[in-house]
Curated annotation (Swiss-Prot):
Protein residues bound to substrate: D24, F25, N26, R40, H63, F64, G65, R66, R122, R155
Family membership: Belongs to the phosphoglycerate kinase family.
GO cellular component: cytosol
GO BP field: gluconeogenesis; glycolytic process
Chain positions recorded as ATP binding sites: K206, G297, E328, G358, G359, D360, S361
Single GO MF descriptor: ATP binding
Enzymatic reactions: (2R)-3-phosphoglycerate + ATP = (2R)-3-phospho-glyceroyl phosphate + ADP
Keyword hit for tRNA processing: no
EC number: 2.7.2.3
Organism from which the protein derives: Prochlorococcus marinus (strain MIT 9215)
Gene label: pgk
Keyword annotations: ATP-binding, Cytoplasm, Glycolysis, Kinase, Nucleotide-binding, Transferase
Protein transport among keywords: no
Protein name as catalogued: Phosphoglycerate kinase
InterPro entries in the record: Phosphoglycerate_kinase, Phosphoglycerate_kinase_CS, Phosphoglycerate_kinase_N, Phosphoglycerate_kinase_sf
Length: 402
């Protein structure tokens, strides 16, 4: 799906223009209201700086948290405006509301190169309902629209889809363009062999992805809590490990489909067991056919790590979505950390394209200090999953075609 992007617009298109940019500033805060991870803010900087340098008037729209259509003082974008001001080295004003006469007066008074952040669009319930009247009010701030919020592109909301009815051109920002290039590219025209590593605790949340990847991948490695549903489906004892009883048939069907399609589906052969779900639990390594009693699996074992590493060494494109174990507990983080290190090395030394597809895998890679070594780290959890499932993202579909 080829969409117009900011890179196709120059100063003649942008100078003096009021540009509404949808960004993803949904960042984590601590109890003191301070930002603990500004990755998403930094990810939007290239688009914002390009607009500043091309003398546009920049109006940013973002959501924060789930205020349920009401003003919530704890969900104001004040800390975001402060951090963005620091990163840009210039003042970023924040409106009291994203729509209304006062906000419009602020956007109308901008000079070329100024940046204005509209207050949390989700303070209005109309945002998530994709209400066109509300979208029209948002659009009235600007002459044109840029979507740079990949993390919200799978939502058909007023600020991601509705506004495109009233602003033209509507184009992709640099971040959105990069996300589509890597994720869409990995699915549509990857360098092969193509491998996917799929982890996480539940098969149910990854059904669509696994099903879609079976049509595209040469190898699929499965880790995380979901492996125990596959083992139970094979008739193995999994002790107290997490199992989705209603997904046993599905797990069997996925294994059968992989076999029929000639896709190499790798499941761990050994696991790290714990006697309780706790960072201080007693642990032991066990083959998958020797799990019993009150033990539960919380990570993949050392033999499985080696098998996965050997399989990955043959690949040219690797997509990773979901951790291999409970990486938040250091005792059960070895599988996830080993995969992260392997991907970083393959990316650095073998020119393998490594894509970290959002969510917990990103947190794991950042915790390991390896984010910079990957080819691409996706900023969207749900959005990257839906793209990998082959779904159309409403926020992308709404943009002007190239």
């Amino acid at each position: 799906m080829s969409k117009l992007s900011l890179s196709s617009l120059d100063k003649t298109h942008l100078e003096g223009k009021k540009v509404l940019v949808r960004v993803d500033f949904n960042v984590p805060l601590n109890e003191d209201g301070q930002i603990t991870d500004d990755t998403r803010i930094r990810a939007a900087i290239p688009t914002i700086e390009y607009l500043i340098n091309h003398s546009a008037k920049v109006i940013l729209a973002a959501h924060f948290g789930r205020p349920k259509g009401q003003v919530n003082e704890k969900m104001r974008l004040t800390p975001v405006a402060a951090r963005l001001s620091e990163l840009l080295g210039q003042n970023v004003a924040l409106t009291n509301s994203c729509i209304g006469d006062e906000a419009i007066a602020q956007s109308n008074s901008l000079s070329n190169g100024d940046v204005l952040l509209l207050e949390n669009v989700r303070f209005f319930g109309e945002e998530e309902k994709n209400d066109l009247e509300f979208a029209k009010k948002l659009a009235s701030h600007a002459d044109m629209y840029i979507n740079d919020a990949f993390g919200a592109a799978h939502r058909a909301h007023a600020s991601t889809q509705g506004v495109t009815n009233y602003l033209s051109p509507s184009v992709a920002g640099f971040l959105l363009e990069k996300e589509l290039k890597y994720l869409q590219g990995a699915i549509d025209s990857p360098k092969r062999p193509l491998a996917a590593i799929v982890g996480g605790s539940k098969v149910s949340s990854k059904i669509g992805v696994l099903d879609s990847l079976l049509d595209k991948c040469d190898k699929i490695m499965i880790g995380g809590g979901m492996i125990f549903t596959f083992y139970k489906a094979r008739g193995l004892d999994v002790g107290k490990s997490l199992v989705e009883e209603d997904k046993l048939k599905l797990a069997k069907d996925l294994e059968a489909k992989a076999k029929a399609k000639g896709v190499e589906l790798l499941l761990p052969t050994d696991v790290v067991l714990a006697d309780e779900f706790s960072p201080d639990a007693n642990s032991k390594i066990s083959r998958i056919d020797s799990i019993s009693g009150n033990w539960m699996g919380l990570d993949i074992g050392p033999d499985s790590i080696k098998v996965f590493q050997n399989a990955l060494a043959e690949c040219k494109t690797i997509i990773w979505n979901g951790p291999m174990g409970v990486f938040e507990f250091d005792k059960f983080a070895e599988g996830t950390n080993a995969i992260a290190t392997t991907l970083a090395d393959l990316s650095a030394f073998s020119e393998v394209c490594t894509i970290i597809g959002g969510g917990d895998s990103v947190a794991a890679v950042e915790k390991a200090g390896l984010a910079e070594k990957m080819s691409h780290i996706s900023t969207g959890g749900g959005a990257s999953l839906e793209l990998l499932e082959g779904k159309t993202l409403p926020g992308v579909a709404a943009l002007n075609d190239a």
